[in-house]
Curated annotation (Swiss-Prot):
Classification of source organism: Eukaryota, Metazoa, Chordata, Craniata, Vertebrata
Keyword field contains Disulfide bond: no
Keyword field contains Ubl conjugation: no
One record GO biological process: positive regulation of Rac protein signal transduction
Ranges of compositional bias, category Pro residues: 19-32
Protein name, as recorded: Protein farnesyltransferase/geranylgeranyltransferase type-1 subunit alpha
Organism (species): Homo sapiens (Human)
Catalytic reactions of this protein: L-cysteinyl-[protein] + (2E,6E)-farnesyl diphosphate = S-(2E,6E)-farnesyl-L-cysteinyl-[protein] + diphosphate; geranylgeranyl diphosphate + L-cysteinyl-[protein] = S-geranylgeranyl-L-cysteinyl-[protein] + diphosphate
Family according to the record: Belongs to the protein prenyltransferase subunit alpha family.
Keywords for this protein: Acetylation, Magnesium, Phosphoprotein, Prenyltransferase, Repeat, Transferase
Record comment: activity regulation: Activated by the AGRIN-induced phosphorylation which is mediated by MUSK.
Function of the molecule: Essential subunit of both the farnesyltransferase and the geranylgeranyltransferase complex. Contributes to the transfer of a farnesyl or geranylgeranyl moiety from farnesyl or geranylgeranyl diphosphate to a cysteine at the fourth position from the C-terminus of several proteins having the C-terminal sequence Cys-aliphatic-aliphatic-X. May positively regulate neuromuscular junction development downstream of MUSK via its function in RAC1 prenylation and activation.
EC number(s) from the headed UniProt entry: 2.5.1.58, 2.5.1.59
GO molecular function: acetyltransferase activator activity; alpha-tubulin binding; CAAX-protein geranylgeranyltransferase activity; enzyme binding; microtubule binding; molecular adaptor activity; protein farnesyltransferase activity; protein geranylgeranyltransferase activity
Domain of life: Eukaryota
Length: 379
């Protein structure tokens, strides 16, 4: 693929591959730009940084298309190549086409200059999901020895506007890797999660930061706080599992008992929400649901006052685990499981009645005796 491909409005994905041929040497800044900077220096004027407030937004009335700028006269814009017979061709705005035609040109030349860096900002303003622009911007950050702390401020502002964009979070991650400074990250992510506590981009970044820089301290307390605010948030339950799995683990009986009882208390608050039930099943399933001491009795005690499809389904899972492990009273346990499957099918989870009847038939087929097959599951 040519270096200029994949930079249209809809381009997304991972980092672009290395070119087949060695890249050309970076072009120096054009004479017009160099002369302008020299004149400004002689006059004692500061040359504006691309991150200065003086940056002209594309929405500004004073914005000038690149093709009309004298300092870009040395560049031949490279149009997007949609092939000889494009189908359903995207109609780009004149401004979008202008910016990306010039971006393709500097990318093709591998021009590592201040003007190319400023151009990436315009391209990002038009489409912050374009991975090629972000990649080239990072090349320029290194080549031009830009202030990475300023770049962190820049990406912070963009993420606050577009918090569900893969490319902006990846750019931030690379900056944190370069700086080896995670000091702002947990607070920043918490601010983003305050806007949407289920933003998986933010959670993914948080997990990476914590794991990369060993920031495990206080994370479980943070999770506790979020669960108190919204016990239904499956993302927070996932974070709880992530933290404990990577710290104490669940093999310590005291940790496991704490988590089981913690989860049961949360279930009492919202018995009809699946998140806590999934967590409970996740931490016990590999150990055997029926083998955890007194869990069955605790759930049976909950059933009269906190009955829900999830509680009954969990009981079915426990009974199935008992059957798989060759329990003594096999026929009695099987009948209890079949009865619960029928309750789910007829009363508690009717939208999945065929599923529960299938589960019942499967249990019956696998675990009933040949001479005395239970008949309380409808066909």
């Amino acid at each position: 693929m040519a270096a200029t491909e994949g930079v249209g409005e809809a381009a997304q994905g991972g980092e672009p591959g290395q070119p087949a041929q060695p890249p050309p040497q970076p072009h120096p800044p054009p004479p017009q730009q160099q002369h302008k900077e020299e004149m400004a220096a002689e006059a004692g004027e500061a040359v504006a940084s691309p991150m200065d407030d003086g940056f002209v937004s594309l929405d500004s009335p004073s914005y000038v298309l690149y093709r009309d700028r004298a300092e870009w006269a040395d560049i031949d814009p490279v149009p997007q190549n949609d092939g000889p017979n494009p189908v359903v061709q995207i109609i780009y705005s004149d401004k979008f086409r202008d910016v990306y035609d010039y971006f393709r040109a500097v990318l093709q030349r591998d021009e590592r200059s201040e003007r190319a860096f400023k151009l990436t900002r315009d391209a990002i303003e038009l489409n912050a999901a374009n991975y090629t622009v972000w990649h080239f911007r990072r090349v320029l950050l290194k080549s031009l020895q830009k202030d990475l702390h300023e770049e962190m401020n820049y990406i912070t502002a963009i993420i606050e506007e577009q918090p569900k964009n893969y490319q902006v979070w990846h750019h931030r991650r690379v900056l944190v890797e370069w700086l080896r400074d995670p000091s702002q990250e947990l607070e920043f992510i918490a601010d983003i999660l305050n806007q949407d506590a289920k933003n998986y981009h933010a959670w993914q970044h948080r997990q990476w930061v914590i794991q990369e820089f060993k920031l495990w301290d206080n994370e479980l307390q943070y999770v506790d706080q979020l669960l108190k605010e919204d016990v239904r948030n499956n993302s927070v339950w996932n974070q709880r599992y992530f933290v404990i799995s990577n710290t104490t683990g669940y093999n310590d009986r005291a940790v496991l008992e704490r988590e089981v009882q913690y989860t049961l208390e949360m279930i009492k608050l919202v018995p009809h929400n699946e998140s806590a039930w999934n967590y409970l099943k996740g931490i016990l399933q590999d150990r055997g649901l029926s083998k955890y001491p007194n869990l069955l009795n605790q759930l049976l005690d909950l059933q009269p006052s906190h009955s829900s499809p999830y509680l009954i389904a969990f009981l079915v899972d426990i009974y199935e685990d008992m059957l798989e492990n060759q329990c003594d009273n096999k026929e009695d346990i099987l009948n209890k499981a079949l009865e619960l499957c029928e309750i789910l099918a007829k009363e508690k989870d009717t939208i999945r009645k065929e599923y529960w009847r299938y589960i019942g038939r499967s249990l019956q087929s696998k675990h009933s005796t040949e001479n005395d097959s239970p008949t309380n599951v409808q066909q």
